[in-house]
A protein has these predicted regions:
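A short, well-ordered alpha-helix in the C-terminal region of glycosyltransferases
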Residues: 116, 123-137, 149
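Short hydrophobic beta-strand element within catalytic cores of glycosyltransferases
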Residues: 79-82, 99
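C-terminal alpha-helical cap of glycosyltransferases
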Residues: 140-165
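Short alpha-helical donor nucleotide-sugar binding micro-motif in glycosyltransferases
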Residues: 40, 49-53
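Nucleotide-activated donor-binding/catalytic signature segment of Leloir-type glycosyltransferases, i.e.
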Residues: 8, 17-40
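A short hydrophobic beta-strand element within the catalytic core of glycosyltransferases
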Residues: 56-58
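A short alpha->beta transition loop at the rim of the catalytic pocket in nucleotide-sugar-dependent
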Residues: 54, 77
């Protein structure tokens, strides 16, 4: 049986609810313990929630610029199911994720993909491995190293080596 844990809140760091969330909670009541809501979760606690999941679903309906939730989930070794939005296809460009279109049937596509991944644990395992490797490209250490390298390349005549920066 598939269970759904909805993590987070519509307003970062706040406990207030949106009309959408209230409606979602009302609909979920009919499903009993199959759907749970955590409310707001601090960022430093998120890895615990990612590791609870067999799959992390990021069904954004807006243009998601960075898709950090997807990158964080991959970093925790979780396969990702997301909507094709903003920068998401750039981050999720390979075998680590399933992307669905944001069209009139997004709920149907998500449902199909969740069931398909539920029924194929071997595919989830492959996606997890690929995702963990992909997430390394987006680590803060990697961004720092790339930034230092760019600064050094741009103004290299000012320093002897990147380590002197």
């Amino acid at each position: 049986r598939i269970k759904l844990l909805i993590v987070g809140s519509p307003f970062f760091g706040r406990t207030q609810q949106s009309p959408f969330l209230r409606k979602l909670e009302q609909q979920a009541e009919t499903l009993g313990d199959r759907v749970r809501f955590t409310g707001y979760v601090p960022n430093d606690s998120m890895p615990e929630y990612y590791r609870l999941a067999d799959l992390v679903c990021v069904p954004t309906l807006v243009e998601e610029a960075a898709g950090l939730v997807a990158v964080e989930a991959m970093g925790c070794g979780r396969p990702v199911l997301a909507t094709r939005s903003g920068g998401m296809p750039e981050y999720l460009d390979g075998s680590q994720a399933v992307l669905v279109d944001r069209d009139g049937n997004v709920a149907g596509q998500l449902s199909f993909a969740i069931r398909m991944l539920y029924e194929h644990p071997d595919l989830r395992a492959q996606m997890s491995t690929a995702g963990a490797k992909t997430a390394q490209r987006y680590s803060s250490a990697r961004f720092y190293d790339d930034f230092v390298r760019i600064v050094y390349d741009f103004g290299g005549h000012l320093w002897n080596s990147p380590s002197s920066v």
